[in-house]
């Protein structure tokens, strides 16, 4: 069993009223999720080909889900100057019962010493229920691939793509996503100096994120448009020599049991599977 504590944005009682017709508020009374999972893995690691495959099943009886409903704004605690009109109110509850069957795959292939191909994929079928008749289910999948080629020893070119299908949540779904990256690295001074040119989504001028949500007496659809392109130059220089040796063990504590997310004004539904 894995316990996931709600992140600060889920707990924050601050009322986001930037859009007076779509209000969002955290819930400080949330409890930690209790997740149960079963996994089966198989892998092989060799010089030219390495891969790992896993299948799993997990379920949560008190999962944290965002929930939307239509209310009159004078019912919302903390709202300044209510008018009595209908608004879409979003908050979070331990109301979800989730079940997911998943598949993960990873492969790294080097047909030549100068060429490397990496592919990673995830897929799953999920079922959401609030225990009171509200249900949603569906498939989702993501694929990442990267091809890296060394040219004349000091030049390295790489291209990568990422594709994610639409994700589902308790009250709706979100649109899928696609991105691509090109990079070129030049190594000099015996690999001490590296200059990297990177282009993110150079062939995609605009991107639209769409989401749909529905409930009792309402249905919403939203679209966010933004420019995904970026171009950058990175320079790194290594000082000194790399030396092998015994490194003293450092004791650290890492808290990775926090469920992230939440906090978006007008957020349309709970955590998406596949996002």
Show the residue positions of the predicted features.
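Transmembrane beta-strands of outer-membrane beta-barrel proteins
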Residues: 1, 43, 52-56, 106, ...
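Surface-exposed extracellular loop regions of Gram-negative outer-membrane beta-barrel proteins
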Residues: 1-36, 57-84, 202-216
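Transmembrane beta-strands of outer-membrane beta-barrel pores
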Residues: 1-5, 36, 44-46, 57-61, ...
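Extracytoplasmic loops and strand-loop junctions of Gram-negative outer membrane beta-barrel proteins
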Residues: 19-26, 35, 83-92, 101, ...
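Outer membrane beta-barrel strand-and-loop segments of large Gram-negative receptors
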Residues: 25-27, 31, 46, 50-120, ...
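Outer-membrane beta-barrel architecture
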Residues: 29, 39-43, 52, 104-108, ...
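Conserved C-terminal beta-signal and adjacent last beta-strands/turns
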Residues: 137-275
């Amino acid at each position: 069993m894995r316990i996931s504590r709600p992140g600060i944005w889920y707990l924050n009682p601050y009322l986001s009223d930037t859009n007076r017709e779509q209000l969002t508020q955290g819930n400080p009374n949330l409890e930690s999720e209790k997740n149960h999972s079963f996994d089966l893995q198989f892998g092989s690691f060799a010089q030219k080909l390495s891969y790992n495959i896993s299948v799993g099943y997990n379920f949560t009886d008190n999962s944290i889900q965002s929930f939307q409903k239509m209310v009159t704004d004078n019912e919302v605690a903390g709202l300044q100057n209510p008018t009595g009109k209908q608004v879409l109110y979003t908050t979070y509850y331990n109301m979800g019962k989730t079940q997911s069957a998943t598949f993960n795959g990873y492969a790294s292939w080097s047909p030549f010493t100068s060429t490397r191909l990496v592919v990673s994929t995830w897929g799953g079928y999920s079922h959401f229920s609030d225990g009171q008749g509200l249900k949603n289910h569906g498939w989702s999948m993501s694929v990442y691939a990267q091809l890296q080629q060394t040219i004349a020893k000091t030049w390295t070119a790489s291209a990568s793509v990422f594709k994610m299908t639409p994700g589902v949540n308790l009250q709706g779904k979100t649109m899928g996503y696609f991105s691509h990256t090109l990079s070129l690295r030049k190594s000099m001074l015996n690999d001490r100096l590296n200059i990297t040119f990177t282009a993110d989504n150079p062939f995609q001028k605009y991107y639209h994120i769409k989401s749909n949500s529905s409930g009792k007496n309402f249905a919403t659809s939203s679209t966010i448009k933004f420019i995904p392109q970026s171009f950058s130059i990175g320079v790194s220089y290594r000082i000194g020599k790399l030396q092998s040796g015994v490194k003293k063990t450092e004791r650290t504590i890492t808290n990775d049991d926090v469920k992230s997310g939440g906090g978006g004004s007008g957020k349309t539904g709970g955590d998406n599977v596949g996002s």
